């Protein structure tokens, strides 16, 4: 009787009776009658949960990267694995409230955050919510809701890098110039000063404050982030900086999303025709977080246990840094990704991936750092592929031969260890190389203006500095800088030297400055 009732309900002829066909047609008919397809595509149910990753049934029409809500739990997640009978979802937050049977709802959109100018000077989490205890962010007329996953600017919208992005670090601005819209990797072992260079670049924008800075802390300790924020605030740099934080205690999905959130904030200002600088500190921890998520989702591991698409997660992030042309507002987004190496191995998987994506790298060496050469930049392994087009005429002229001189010094310094009987030319090259290295040293959190940088490089070639004892070089540099800042005309020239279009070292105010100081 029950079978007859089923057949009648779905209008199946008795002659076509077959147990399998009846059940199949019955399911289809009931699904259509009660519109269950729509319900099952929008809602799902947790099958099991483990280590922040859940398997969900239903959600048949969900897309990769789509945002989902755990109903009644005030928690969100993102779909990363689409399988035949289930969906793999990572949770953005604590998973203690999630259990088998919890209802999951599609949000039918990718993760998005609210972005506005009011974020300047604030510390926010991955979801764009303030965590600095200074109150909520209020919506204004300029507030935009932007997806954290956005397509990189196309070829037609871009313009070649041609404007300088000064870091305030002598060795970088002279030998590894960076332009607005460039992606320059900072790479090196742990505790070699990688973050210090990026932070100096942020502090250096205080001169004209026309660049908005975003610092993305991925997997950092809370105490480290707190010290950074306090230092930026003390130096007056926090007012044009936004700090996006995902600490080491946060779940892997939050650490994974942090760089994309920071990039979206930077794109907001870039699209407004402004200039932005973003620091990703660091993408090694970002890759580890993604590896953790992928292994929990049972994705097949590849080299160093990273999933096959680990290159893509970084390329799609870094390609969003660009210099836009006049039609699209002339804005720019400059990226400083940071990568940590193990024992100086730049041939590891993640370092080689990011080196191939970026427009150059600043390589910091542990050996140089331990010798007291700071910033510990290895000039031979470092390069800036597009920044030379943005370098000022003054710096280009003065620093032209500097890299060659340093290379010659490094080559001869190796032989100096084995032989003390060097000819006069070799002795001169070695002495000048040591002087140059001494003058290129710089204290952390003390960026220099382009004018003062150019002056110090000019001073390297003067007879006064050439004849100085190496132990006196740093103190003489400090005295010279104080002297320049005490004379209004010199200080004014140093401030506007970046705008000088043509430069002749023999006929310059620099010569007058140095001669005046020596007298």
UniProtKB/Swiss-Prot annotation:
Chain positions of site Required for activity: 382
Binding site for ATP: 188-195
Ion transport is among the record's keywords: yes
PROSITE patterns: ATPASE_ALPHA_BETA (PS00152)
Major localisation: mitochondrion
The UniProt record lists the keyword Cell inner membrane: no
Family: Belongs to the ATPase alpha/beta chains family.
Assembly and oligomerization: F-type ATPases have 2 components, CF(1) - the catalytic core - and CF(0) - the membrane proton channel. CF(1) has five subunits: alpha(3), beta(3), gamma(1), delta(1), epsilon(1). CF(0) has three main subunits: a, b and c.
Name of the protein described by the UniProt record: ATP synthase subunit alpha, mitochondrial
Organism of provenance: Dictyostelium discoideum (Social amoeba)
